[in-house]
Amino acid sequence: MDAPVPAAPAFGGSWAKLNPPLSPWILDVINSMGFKNMTPVQAGTIPRAVKNQDCVVEAVTGSGKTLAFTIPVLERLSRREEPYKKGEIAAIVVAPTRELATQIHAVFHHFLSSLIPPESEEETGDVEAHAPPFASSSRSPSPQTPDKPLFPLPMLVTSGTPTPYETFQSTHPSILIGTPGRLAAFLLNPRGLAIVRVSELDVLVLDEADRLLSSPDHRRDVERIMRHLPKQRRTHLFSATMTDAVEEMIGLGLRNPVRIVVNLKDKRKDGEEPKERRTPMALQNTYLVCRHAEKTLQLIRLLLCESTKHERSKFIVYFSTCAAVDYFYRILSRLPSLSKFHLTSFHGELPPKIRETALSTFTSHPSSHLSPAVLLCTDVAARGVDFLDIDVVIQYDAPTDPKTFSHRAGRTARAGRRGKAVVLLGKGREEDYVGTFQSANAELMKRKRQKAQRSILDFLNIRKIPLTKQPYINAYLEEVDTPQALDPEATTLLHSIRQIILTDRELSDKAAKSFVSAFRAYSKHEASFIFRTLDFDFNSQAISFGLLRLPAMPEIKDWKKKKEAERQRLEKIKSEGGEVEEKEIIEWEDAGVNWDTFAYASRQREAARLATLAQRADNQSSNDAARAEARAKRKIKAEMREAWSEQKERKVRKEERKEKKDAKKKYEWELEQANGEGDRQSDLANIAKAQAERKKRREREEESWDEEIGKEYKSLKREIKEEKSVKESSKGGAGGGGIGGGMFDDLE
């Protein structure tokens, strides 16, 4: 590989200074978009990409990478002497997500649609007006001039593209943009092999290459596409971060590539070494430390503080899982304190059409500080999707993959705008995520480094992502130090969320699901030496999620055992006069809920739940009867295994107990009569008579009971003997060696 290209200046210069110069029609479109000057990544990439060079481009998010590959593709297409024939492909752009592919398609479409003459636009206006933003459109043939050639519009190949082969045959696009799986299926399907010709392909672009190659499925599809394409092509890789997988792909799929790295450096005083960074210079990157129980409270206060005090109007909030996004969207949208906010849910498990609608609703919302817009999402919106007007990014959960941190934060402070990013971190060990103790006691820092094998501190500083501390926000939206005890408002918020959940059992199900999924994501964090499951406080997290009760998880059961063992250990140390470091204990109490009557708001789901309860009750009664019969069988089997002498002794002991009981009652009665008055002899006769009657009555009851029980006993005993004989016969049949094994069965 060639030596890295020197970093471009802060401003890449005028578009007119490019060498070789761009076509006039491309410059016209750029000027109409309002871009007066190039960014450094554009100035470094476009001249080399227009020529016959493969490019590997690493630049911070929001630096203009999309135009850096769009313009060279169009310029090479415009300079080609022989136009492409129908069915031939000039360029393919691969993006990891549908949203990013749609955005890239819109940029290509904007350039190429500018070549359609006004009269042609009027003829096809009705078609274009009703066409979806991802669909390619055909156009009427019009005369072209050297200044304004005519090219077919690009085609988007994603999960939302209807009838792709019909669209391809009707529009004959020269440029395909799509996701890896859909593109691979489109190109390598027998029908695609027949109608899509790639022998003349000129350029392949891999946008967000690190994400494309980090996913096994994406990587497999990308490799299939690359094997299908001609080797004599230009290949460009673009990303904000470079990984080992990207480096491997550079060696396999590129020819003599040039590496273009655009760095940002903080300004320093004279004599100080400037520090590199991987986030935009206009970004205020911060972190806020709180207890896990206070995270939702701090999220709400951040939204209120930034919108009211700083007049921010557009926010993105990142969660680690789709279940958490779905749950918090339903809860936060019903909190009175956030009634003025317009919330949108966006994650990968939504159907493509709903995702598209959600994204469109958020971007088009006329937000202001009086009516802010908030997008609750997962990392599906962390890369490539270009939000030009995001004011604040809040990371409720630190990303599982630390490389995603810069991509999340980079959704704001784009195209020269200022922006703010905040990540919420748990109090304690999670503070090491940003090197909180770097300026603390040097000796303490040294011991911590040795204990954690010199790897836990300054995690993001090592990754060239500088952060500053965001103070805790109190109930008056004032910035203060993190409170020593749990914020009382956290408990108040817990009760408010519980009141919302109690309106629909489905919310309780979603709360439990999101809680479990959040812990699973926490346990899979790549920085597991910082985000340790051993330090995870389930009680604290449950308060933040507003749960009615802790879910049945084996991890919680083990955690409670360890917690109790630790408590007993500390109490023992205290009783022996030792000193114990007091640790904060956050208590948890389940909500008082009658789970049998707690209903779903949906009539269908509630009817299904009640039917399940009834079925469970029937099964319970039948199970109780089966268990009683099993107990009786076990008792009979035990008696059958007893010796005859033991059975006789047991009966004798039973009779002795009865006689002792009668003698005791007689003695008690005689004692009462000795203290009273009356005819002694008459009373004794009455006693003997009553005693004889009781004995006869008991004998009759025992006879009837013995008769009933005896029948059941004999029936069970007969059943046990039959089971035993069946087992013995099956054993004999399996053995096949002795007389009982059926050796002479055929001699009759």
Curated annotation (Swiss-Prot):
Q: Where is this region: Disordered?
A: 119-156, 614-748
Q: Name one Pfam family in it.
A: Helicase_C
User: Annotated motif DEAD box: location in the chain?
Assistant: 207-210
Q: Where is this motif: Q motif?
A: 15-43
Compositional bias, Low complexity, is annotated for: 132-142
Please name the GO terms that the record assigns under molecular function.
ATP binding; ATP hydrolysis activity; RNA binding; RNA helicase activity
User: Carries keyword ATP-binding?
Assistant: yes
Provide a GO biological process annotation.
assembly of large subunit precursor of preribosome
TM region positions: none
User: Which positions fall inside the Helicase ATP-binding domain?
Assistant: 46-260
Q: What family is this protein classified in?
A: Belongs to the DEAD box helicase family. DDX55/SPB4 subfamily.
**Record remark on domains:** The Q motif is unique to and characteristic of the DEAD box family of RNA helicases and controls ATP binding and hydrolysis.
Q: What is this protein called?
A: ATP-dependent rRNA helicase SPB4
In which organism is this protein found? Cryptococcus neoformans var. neoformans serotype D (strain B-3501A) (Filobasidiella neoformans)
Starting at the broadest rank, the lineage of the source organism is: Eukaryota, Fungi, Dikarya, Basidiomycota, Agaricomycotina
